[in-house]
Amino acid sequence: MKLILQLLLITCLIGKSYAQENNKNIFKKTDAYLESTIDSLKIIGLNYAILVDNKVVHKKSYGLAHAQLKVPMTIDMSFPVASLSKLFSSVALHKLLSIHKRSVSETVEDFLPNRNDFPETWRKLTLKQLLSHTSGVPDQIDYQIFLAPDSEKFVIDTLKDKPFSSSPGTESKYNATGFLLIRAIIEKLANQDFESYMQTEYFDKFNLSSAKYGGFKKIIQNRVTCYQNRDGNLEMFPLNYSPPMYAGAGLNISLNDLIKWFQAIQDEKILTKEQLNEIWTPVKLNSGKDGYFGLGWESYKLQGGYRMVGHGGAGISSFRYYWNEQTNQNVTVILLTNGALNWTIRPNQINSQIATMILEGK
């Protein structure tokens, strides 16, 4: 019996050693791929992480946080993550819906009955339509109202007489205005302003010390400078946001804190698995076809039984969780960059390539 136990222990140790060596080889490949990609795209700086079974298995920094000052990138740098902000808002909203026993099938008017400044057509939209980008509500971006409007009133007054881009429920079309309304609904359910609610209920509670809302004009400690290509030259990329749009964009956060938040989600410290499944399931269009979004999250069914949820951010960052319910395989890949000179492929594509390398190597 003693000999058998010794043999079993040796077998387990050999198996663990092989798995660790295999992982090292995979990460060498992902690092080599990233280093080549960074070089060809002229990415200024990048932090990335890989999680398997909700545990960090690899993370690394590359390049510069500030090109003009030659400040090296470090793993604790804060990034403006743009539309990744929607993931935080989606989770916070669903927690509030659960507390108040409300539903995404309810309308804007159900949540905000006294908002007569909203057009009647807006008041009839459901929360599900707003979250899944199927509302068709006039998109402020189409009318050159970008993500730093002076006030909510300015956006509403400018758009209230504009036509819908499509009938509600008929088309998946990315829409910024919908998250202006979502912010108002979160504030109503939380009974406090959006920024304060997110700070106390999420950033403080889960010790996300780097998480702060604000555009490039706001001084935020340890934040990278973002860059873009303008006529072949590298210049600063002014990602500007104002409070009316914070539910949709405007969050700044480090890679480590983004990981911490997602681990809390996966550990069901915020929502249940059933609630996450609802958020992550693609919303069907009126035609019966799947749209491109769940409830605030990009959501796709991939080949081989895989699914993917997550979001991109300003075309310079990418957060994606991939899983296969049949094989129990899963991987989360997070790429945060501060821009590049030559985006021939974007972070979402790079993210998918890294995930493929990890899943095929397992």
Listing of model-derived features with the role each one plays in the protein:
Residues 141-220, 244-259:
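Catalytic-site signature segments of enzymes, centered on catalytic residues
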Residues 64-66, 107-115, 144-146, 216, ...:
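Short linear capping/connector segments at secondary-structure termini
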Residues 80-83, 98-138, 161, 188-226, ...:
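Active-site helix/loop module of the DD-peptidase/beta-lactamase fold
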Residues 1-23:
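Bacterial Sec-dependent N-terminal signal peptides
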Residues 20-61, 187-192, 196-200, 204, ...:
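Catalytic loop of the DD-peptidase/beta-lactamase superfamily, centered on the K-T-G motif
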Residues 26, 30, 77, 104, ...:
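Residue-level signature of the cytosolic catalytic core of signaling kinases
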Residues 41-47, 69-129, 166-177, 246-249, ...:
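Short active-site loop at a secondary-structure junction
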